[in-house]
Amino acid sequence: MSNYLEFFKICGKLKTLKRTGWVNHGVELPESVSDHMYRMAMMGMCLDKKELIGEDGKEIDKMKIIKMALVHDLGESLVGDFTPHDKITKEEKYQLEKNAIIEITNTLSGEVGKEIFDLWQEYEDCKTNEALLVKDFDKFEMILQAYEYEKQPHQLENKIKLQSFFDSTRGKFHHPLFKSLALQLESDRK
């Protein structure tokens, strides 16, 4: 039987868990992990049929990308938000988050818990059109947030510090729309 209350409490932790990259770069009032996941889900929500085509020409499942965006960082509610600069290997990060997802999904009934775990695993494996697109959401949401921080009057001194976020994503987008949006955002920064 599902323990919905426990699951909802775990999800609630993401509302107050600040994104570590912004904290480490001295951003005032940094977004939460929940904020990040919400805008990613909205990215999936607003795409129309013509944009839901993968590199292989196959249709992308819209509902799946929305759900995947909502669960991709769920494990961080128990283990925290790691950055590439943390002293932890990718494999260690993966194992910590996998164990957290298992613990979290064990609070739900088998079918629902399995769906969440499978979505998370598909995102981590990054082999499907849906996972590749949600990875693009993840990267684009980050640089869009960096852009927004740079435009805030009290953050202007952070412009050089936030350049690394843009550098880390340059040339790494798969979907044509997000390749284009990333280039447009870079142009808007000038």
Swiss-Prot record:
<keyword id="KW-0460">Magnesium</keyword>
<keyword id="KW-0479">Metal-binding</keyword>
<feature type="binding site">
    <location>
        <position position="138"/>
    </location>
    <ligand>
        <name>a divalent metal cation 1</name>
    </ligand>
</feature>
<comment type="subunit">
    <text>Homodimer.</text>
</comment>
<feature type="domain" description="HD">
    <location>
        <begin position="33"/>
        <end position="143"/>
    </location>
</feature>
<dbReference type="GO" id="GO:0046872">
    <property type="term" value="F:metal ion binding"/>
</dbReference>
<keyword id="KW-0464">Manganese</keyword>
<feature type="binding site">
    <location>
        <position position="81"/>
    </location>
    <ligand>
        <name>a divalent metal cation 2</name>
    </ligand>
</feature>
<feature type="binding site">
    <location>
        <position position="76"/>
    </location>
    <ligand>
        <name>a divalent metal cation 2</name>
    </ligand>
</feature>
<dbReference type="InterPro" id="IPR003607">
    <property type="entry name" value="HD/PDEase_dom"/>
</dbReference>
<protein>
    <recommendedName>
        <fullName>5'-deoxynucleotidase HDDC2</fullName>
        <ecNumber>3.1.3.89</ecNumber>
    </recommendedName>
</protein>
<dbReference type="Pfam" id="PF13023">
    <property type="entry name" value="HD_3"/>
</dbReference>
<keyword id="KW-0170">Cobalt</keyword>
<feature type="binding site">
    <location>
        <position position="73"/>
    </location>
    <ligand>
        <name>a divalent metal cation 1</name>
    </ligand>
</feature>
<comment type="similarity">
    <text>Belongs to the HDDC2 family.</text>
</comment>
<feature type="binding site">
    <location>
        <position position="36"/>
    </location>
    <ligand>
        <name>a divalent metal cation 1</name>
    </ligand>
</feature>
<keyword id="KW-0378">Hydrolase</keyword>
<dbReference type="InterPro" id="IPR039356">
    <property type="entry name" value="YfbR/HDDC2"/>
</dbReference>
<feature type="binding site">
    <location>
        <position position="72"/>
    </location>
    <ligand>
        <name>a divalent metal cation 1</name>
    </ligand>
</feature>
<dbReference type="InterPro" id="IPR006674">
    <property type="entry name" value="HD_domain"/>
</dbReference>
<comment type="function">
    <text>Catalyzes the dephosphorylation of the nucleoside 5'-monophosphates deoxyadenosine monophosphate (dAMP), deoxycytidine monophosphate (dCMP), deoxyguanosine monophosphate (dGMP) and deoxythymidine monophosphate (dTMP).</text>
</comment>
<dbReference type="GO" id="GO:0002953">
    <property type="term" value="F:5'-deoxynucleotidase activity"/>
</dbReference>
